[in-house]
């Protein structure tokens, strides 16, 4: 008979959120249930209820986790780009991948469809903090390009494949447009442009 290691509250929450992220990427947002996450980490449904209160609570925490980790990655790419060690395309690809491959777009749309709009607050706050941390909040051009980049990435994650196919455009068309937009915004703001 094996004895399970007792996890701290923070360790349990972290394990659950990481399992939820894996389920999101593998199977989509509908798979992120308390039962599925509990099964994946070897805990009980009641244990997860204790930590998150509901599936919506777990999804909100997952959204916060994704937003914080993704924004940290994007911030590093922006800073590298400004230092001449990265490109606008790096920022675009990370943002688009966050909404597509990392499941951010699917999770956001799933939460909206299910009436859980407040669960998107961590995403919106993390993006705002990212812009603020990068010292761009005072610049209207950069705020607008951040908004456009995020909306383009979200739209591409949800409809990009079928829409580019229908319009007979290359699959990366939205990414190309976003890159051109970021380069133009950087030039307008007097920021260095690499690549």
Name what the model sees in each region.
Residues 55, 62, 66, 70, ...:
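Hydrophobic/aromatic residues within well-ordered alpha-helical segments
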Residues 1-11, 194-195:
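N-terminal intrinsically disordered/low-complexity leader segments
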Residues 61, 72-105, 139-140, 146:
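Hydrophobic alpha-helical connector segments
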Residues 15, 19-57, 61:
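Helix-turn-helix
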Residues 89-137:
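Short secondary-structure transition hinges
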Residues 117-128, 134-195:
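Hydrophobic/aromatic-rich alpha-helical bundle segments in the mid-to-C-terminal region
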């Amino acid at each position: 008979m094996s004895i399970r290691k007792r996890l701290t509250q923070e360790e349990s929450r972290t394990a659950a959120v990481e399992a939820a992220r894996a389920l999101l990427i593998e199977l989509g947002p509908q798979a992120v249930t308390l039962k599925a996450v509990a099964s994946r980490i070897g805990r009980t449904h009641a244990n997860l209820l204790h930590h998150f209160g509901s599936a919506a609570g777990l999804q909100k925490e997952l959204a916060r986790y994704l937003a914080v980790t993704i924004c940290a990655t994007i911030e590093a790419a922006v800073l590298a780009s400004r230092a001449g060690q990265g490109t606008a395309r790096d920022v675009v690809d990370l943002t688009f991948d966050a909404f597509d491959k990392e499941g951010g777009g699917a999770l956001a749309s799933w939460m909206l469809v299910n009436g859980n709009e407040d669960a998107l607050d961590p995403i919106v706050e993390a993006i705002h903090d990212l812009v603020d941390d990068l010292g761009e909040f005072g610049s209207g051009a950069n705020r607008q390009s951040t908004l456009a980049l995020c909306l383009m990435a979200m739209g591409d994650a949800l409809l990009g494949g079928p829409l580019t196919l229908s319009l007979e455009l290359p699959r990366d068309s939205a990414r190309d447009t976003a890159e051109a937009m970021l380069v133009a915004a950087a030039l307008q703001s007097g920021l260095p442009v690499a690549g």
